[in-house]
Curated annotation (Swiss-Prot):
This enzyme is used in a preparative method to synthesize ample amount of GDP-D-glycero-alpha-D-manno-heptose to be used in elucidating biosynthetic pathways of various heptose components present in capsular polysaccharide (CPS) of C.jejuni. Belongs to the D-alpha-D-heptose-1-P guanylyltransferase family. This is D-glycero-alpha-D-manno-heptose 1-phosphate guanylyltransferase. GO terms for molecular function: GTP binding; guanylyltransferase activity. It catalyses: D-glycero-alpha-D-manno-heptose 1-phosphate + GTP + H(+) = GDP-D-glycero-alpha-D-manno-heptose + diphosphate. Pathway: Nucleotide-sugar biosynthesis; GDP-D-glycero-alpha-D-manno-heptose biosynthesis; GDP-D-glycero-alpha-D-manno-heptose from D-glycero-alpha-D-manno-heptose 7-phosphate: step 3/3; Capsule biogenesis; capsule polysaccharide biosynthesis. It holds the Pfam family NTP_transferase. GO terms for biological process: capsule polysaccharide biosynthetic process; GDP-mannose biosynthetic process; nucleotide-sugar biosynthetic process. It comes from the Bacteria. It is an enzyme of class 2 (transferase). Its EC number is 2.7.7.71. The gene is hddC. Catalyzes the GDP transfer from GTP to D-glycero-alpha-D-manno-heptose 1-phosphate, yielding GDP-D-alpha-D-heptose. Is able to use ATP, CTP or UTP as substrate in the presence of pyrophosphatase, but at a significantly slower rate. Can also form GDP-alpha-D-mannose from alpha-D-mannose 1-phosphate and GTP.
Length: 221
């Protein structure tokens, strides 16, 4: 199975910490955050990774080259940032049938094999959260089909999009899309057509997009 990692983020909120490098290369003691994702994917049995890169991608390529930890690497290079949707769409030319998609700035320690498509074009990994206002929430029915998305408001309890997906190569085929678009917005607008389903996890999750969580991951690794 192949995995796509989205590495094009500018890391605006981490600028004071990581200076002038791509966000997934944020240093965690003696190695970049992205290396933790590679270690995780190796344990999950992934043999090939496609890195969707843009800003200062040379820094990533210099470190990981064309193979890392026995995982083959291909690079999908965006001359201009295409948004998460545009980046995924561009990488799908490297995908055979289906692929996992992960954010390069989040770590979600789930068992990837539990994500199942069945008749759907996409399966989302959702994280059970308590007392939060930083994320929007996702609602599912008893068949694990996505039935709605909610905006960011304080929630005592809810399910958030954990930033890992299993999707088909042809997920975008029936849609007229701009070159640059947000995958999250695409999902919110089209989850019914995609028959989007979800799998709920309670495993360790962290998003290093803000300094507080970056330092938390740094201290614990």
């Amino acid at each position: 199975m192949q995995a796509i990692i989205l590495c094009g983020g500018l890391g605006t909120r981490l600028k004071s910490i990581i200076k002038d490098i791509p966000k997934p290369m944020a240093p965690i003691n003696d190695k970049p955050f992205l290396e933790f994702i590679f270690e995780y994917l190796k344990k999950q049995g992934i043999k090939e990774v496609i890195l969707a890169v843009s800003y200062k991608y040379e820094v990533i390529k210099e470190y990981f080259k064309d193979e890392f930890l026995g995982i083959k690497i291909k690079y999908s290079i965006e001359k201009e940032p295409l948004g998460t949707g545009g980046a995924i769409k561009e990488t799908l030319k490297f995908v055979k049938n289906e692929a996992y998609v992960l954010n390069g700035d989040t770590f979600f320690d789930i068992d990837l094999s539990k994500l199942k498509l069945n008749e759907s074009k996409i399966c989302l990994a959702l994280k059970q959260m308590n007392d939060f206002d930083r994320y929007g929430t996702v609602n599912v029915d008893e068949q694990d089909l996505v039935i709605s998305f909610e905006e960011k408001v304080f929630k005592k309890q809810g399910l958030i999009n954990g930033g890992i997906y299993l999707l088909t190569k042809d997920i975008f085929n029936d849609f007229a899309l701009q070159e640059k678009f947000s995958f999250e917005e695409f999902l919110q607008e089209n989850y019914k057509k995609l028959k989007a389903r979800a799998c709920i996890f309670d495993d360790y999750f962290i998003d290093i997009g803000v300094p507080e969580d970056y330092y938390h991951f740094l201290i614990n690794n």
